[in-house]
């Protein structure tokens, strides 16, 4: 039975990704997340026209940093993307298959994962993207299984015409 190839991150990643620079102040990051209705954002440093991934800032990171700032007072130096980001986020390559992505999302409870080639940010994959791709792959898998299961054996049909009964 021939099945389709497993989808990979490059098949359904978002290539047009909102990013922030590492020196962006915390209050501006919060405003950016709210304005664009994002739950997280990659922190990048530009190398010419290539965005190099430096880290990842989530809503939870901002909540923690803002609450700490309000409770304990203004930190010195002021908080920026550099100071609140996760410095070594879990990343995937464009070739990461759907089952590895599923494992990452179910094991770590992430909402989004950056897609990188080396340090260059290529895109981002969301949990919903993986669910949608897995659903499409599953439906195709079921169709393939049903085709194989109910495949008509043409030899039986052709040979049936020539059956000789005694």
Predicted regions located by residue number:
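The conserved cystathionine-beta-synthase
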Residues: 20-38, 43-45, 91-109, 116
């Amino acid at each position: 039975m021939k099945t389709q190839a497993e989808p990979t991150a490059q098949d359904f990643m978002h290539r047009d990704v909102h990013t922030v620079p590492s020196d962006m102040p915390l209050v501006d990051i919060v405003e950016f997340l709210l304005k664009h209705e994002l739950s997280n954002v990659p922190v990048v440093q530009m190398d010419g026209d290539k965005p190099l991934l430096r880290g990842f800032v989530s809503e939870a990171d901002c909540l923690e940093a803002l609450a700490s700032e309000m409770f304990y007072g203004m930190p010195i130096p002021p908080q920026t993307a550099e100071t609140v980001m996760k410095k070594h986020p879990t990343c995937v390559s464009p070739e990461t298959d759907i089952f590895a992505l599923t494992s990452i999302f179910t094991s770590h409870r992430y909402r989004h994962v950056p897609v990188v080639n080396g340090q260059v940010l290529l895109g981002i994959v969301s949990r919903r993207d993986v669910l949608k791709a897995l659903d499409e792959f599953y439906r195709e898998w079921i169709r393939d299984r049903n085709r194989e299961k109910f495949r008509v054996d043409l030899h039986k049909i052709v040979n049936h015409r020539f059956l000789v009964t005694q």
